Amino acid sequence: MMMQWKTVRQSVIAALAVTCSFMAGAAPPPVAAPAPAPVSYGVEEDVFHPVRAEHGMVASVDAAATQVGVDVLKQGGNAVDAAVAVGFALAVTHPQAGNLGGGGFMMLRTKDGNVTAIDFREMAPEKATRDMFLDAQGNADSKKSLTSHLASGTPGSVAGFTLALQKYGTMPLDKVIQPAITLARDGFTVNDALAIDLKTYGVETLPNHPTSKAIFWKQDGKPYQKGDKLVQANLAKSLELIAKDGPDAFYKGPIADQIADEMAKNGGLITKADLANYKAVERTPVSGDYRGYQVYSMPPPSSGGIHIVQILNILENFDLHTYGFGSADAMQIMAEAEKYAYADRSEYLGDPDFVKVPWQALTSKAYAKSLAQQIDVNKARPSKEIKPGNLAPYESNQTTHFSVVDKDGNAVAVTYTLNTTFGSGIVAGDTGILMNNQMDDFSAKPGTPNVYGLVGGDANAVGPKKRPLSSMSPTIVVKDGKTWLVTGSPGGSRIITTVLQMVVNTIDYGMNVAEATNAPRFHHQWLPDELRVEKGFSPDTLKLLREKGQNVAVKEAMGSTQSIMIGPDGALYGASDPRSVDDLTAGY
């Protein structure tokens, strides 16, 4: 085990050495990267056509929330105003992942080209300890980290949205939050997505807590179904408090009182001091150049940005366009590149306020070239040669992403979550607010996979005031100095590869945003050693991949991208993912 870890560590150290040698002129000049494919925006001969608008656009997982955002844009609000309005609305209409009691990340590119990242990831409470999720035998106890009051970190969504609005928005908080208040107070019609998730996932946790059951279960003992009206009066009151008193209502006022009381009575750790001390943080985005495009994504504590750039750097050494979309060779190259990135993720990534992340080494072109040289297009490298691991028993797609672009060119990409579907299933007191189970994203025990099958090390160990590692990857791509693609996705460990394929599909294969969204996806996260593919790839291609040594498994759909592309004429082209029901891209 130690030798295997040493091998991974040496790879990063070697990258630094190679980088230095490049700078010293000792290495041969790099081969010119293949050119990107011609860009498509959705012309008549394309199979799938995006939504087109001239002035502003919103893409989200929920039609009602999308319309809230479009209305804000029509009223003269900018992309940040609309994004914050959508974020609060999703907390009402998409409680599977939209939230006030969770956290996430925002990527923002202003009309003048400034790019920034807002980190509103949850934080471990002050009383959190490294071994808090281990049982008497020293093994990780997933019940504690997923469904108990210990599972919740200090929420960040309210702080993140209000910070963004205050610094980059133009509208007052009470105005952008009003649509969410109305939806909660007056009710909305339950759609297919919510009805299915209540029946499939909610039944596991929500009925176990009286305050949760009272909201999402009807008096006949059944969860709300499609077509029912769902009213959330307590959540409306919480939203009204935030509209009136700002984030202090949540972090220092009556909402904080109820959250802290809920935790104190039930063995949770979050205190009023934890809430009062929480701060959203503005960070410098991860950036990279891919075939002449600039890619901006989230820095740690998200692993997404670093590894999207890392994988793209590896892929830049191959002519994917010539191989062709869906070819066995292209999929082989991408799967092998993904293995290396996810291996590094387990060792080096964590909260940058607590651990030193080798950011420059992991995203260097030299390191990527050294990894590319190890990829055999004809033979897969077994993951056990990098590091062994175990398969987690359960996965959830329930994060949510939305993208917004306004008439002036401001662009926002937001991914936020409760972690698993409906989070811990616990509603804090009479707030109507579902609490997250984000503490499971820490490494409860080094080498043991979390709920998404991801293995972590000491860098992501539980610790007071730490933010757990995430895969969330809101991403903005720039072409010729202008915002070109705004994208992101839910999907747990598969977020990184889903967003990666949106970038590759549009740049390397020349797909329009709708084609890139509809194209079948695949994923390799190194452990388990499995190339997971959606339906839609040729059986002959899968046969060739197996012959190359890939452990191919055809499984359910991956991700739910919400993306907007900006054409050279300034027109907006958007697409919501057909893998989700009831989502919507709309503009004006």
Set out the residue ranges of the language-model regions.
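Short, well-structured alpha-helical segments that form the helix of a local strand-helix-strand
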Residues: 80-86, 174-185, 257-260, 325-342, ...
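Extended C-terminal subregions enriched in glycine
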Residues: 466, 508-556
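Internal maturation/activation junctions in enzymes
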Residues: 36, 318-418, 430-431, 446-447, ...
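Short, small/polar residue-rich loop motifs at catalytic or cofactor-binding pockets
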Residues: 282, 396-399, 421, 470-472
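Noncatalytic scaffold domains of N-terminal-nucleophile
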Residues: 28-67, 71, 79-80, 84-245, ...
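Gram-negative bacterial Sec-dependent N-terminal signal peptides
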Residues: 2-25
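Active-site rim segments in enzyme catalytic domains, especially the processed small/beta chain
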Residues: 92-117, 269-271, 411-479, 509, ...
